[in-house]
């Protein structure tokens, strides 16, 4: 009797295997891995709204990511640039987005959701 189990198959196109984000229905904070190499935990209790807009940089730079997702909290605004960001928007709507971080551009073709850049701007210094 063979008791060996096959290793789980992973695919970059599967949202569960995407290195740009993860989903967890039990999280209380969004972990933002910004491009400045800092990690920030923003509590969903301070979430205000999210806004999906076209990336205006596309007009000047044809290789720029096509979408921009703004995630606003009471003390910070997170800007996510990429493609296929609708899945992130849905996860935020349910407070299930566990983390978000950028991935190298070479993975963009294999990922349904590709995050090209993540920046954070704090709106209040002393809270």
Residue ranges of each PLM-predicted region?
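Anionic N-terminal interaction surfaces
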Residues: 1-25
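Short aromatic-glycine motifs in intrinsically disordered, low-complexity regions
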Residues: 27-41
